[in-house]
Amino acid sequence: MSSPQLLAVLERAQTLGHIGSGSIQDFVGHARAHISAARPALDTHWCDLGSGGGLPGLVVAVERPDVDLSLIDRSSSRTAFLGEAVTYLEVAPKVKVVNGDATELAHKNTFRGVFDGVFSRSFGPPAATAECAIAFLANDGQLIVSEPPNEDPRRWPMKELKSLGYADLEIVDGPPRFARLISAIQPDSEVPRSWKHITKRPLF
C-alpha cells in the first residue's frame, strides 16, 4: 500500500500534466518494479534521468530512503514541482532535484561518472538514453530502462553499446519488462553529444 502523501503528490503531478493519464496505483507499482529490477545496494548513488513528475524517482525516494538520489529534468516547471514534492515527502537531503539538460550536465564533474545507477522510465529512445546515461555512470554502474511489453532485439545492439562503454545487457522479462545495461569503462570525452546531434544522428 502506498502512503497517502505519495499518492497525493503523484495525483498532483497528473493534474499538472507531468505524468500521463492512468491509475496512480499502477504507476506506483511500475515504479516499484524499477527498484526490483535494479536491486540498488545500500547507500548507493542513483539518478532518475528525465524524472518528469517523479516516476520512478519519488517512489524510489520513499521506498529506499538509504539511496542518494538525484532527480534530473530539463523543464523548470517540472523541477519546481519535484522540489516541492521532495519537501512535502520529507525525503531531503538524500534526494536532490537538478534542473538542466542531461547532455550538458553529463559533462560537469559534479555528475560525470559518479552514479552507481541510472533509472530511465521515459527519457527518450534507446540510443539517446544509452548515450546520455553512460556518462553519468561509474564503472560497473547499471542503467535500468523501462521497456515495451513486446521484445524487439533491435532496440539494444551490443556492438554499438560496447562502443559507448557498456559491457553487458540483460532483459528483465517481468512483467513489466526492463533493460539492464552494465557500464564497463568511461566513455570518450565528447560523449554525450548535444541533444540535437543525438536525435538527428542516433548511434543506432
Model regions and ranges:
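Conserved beta-strand signature within the Rossmann-like core of class I S-adenosyl-L-methionine
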Residues: 140-150
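Conserved SAM-binding strand-loop segment of SAM-dependent methyltransferases
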Residues: 91-102
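Conserved SAM-binding motif I beta-strand of class I
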Residues: 68-73
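A short acidic, Gly/Pro-enriched loop at the edge of an enzyme's catalytic core
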Residues: 103, 107-117
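A short glycine-rich, Lys/Arg-flanked "PGG" loop and its adjoining helix->strand segment in the class I
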Residues: 128-142
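Class I SAM-dependent transferase core
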Residues: 1-47, 77, 84-90
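Conserved SAM-binding loop of SAM-dependent methyltransferases across substrates and taxa
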Residues: 53-66
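SAM/dcSAM-binding transferase cores
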Residues: 155-204
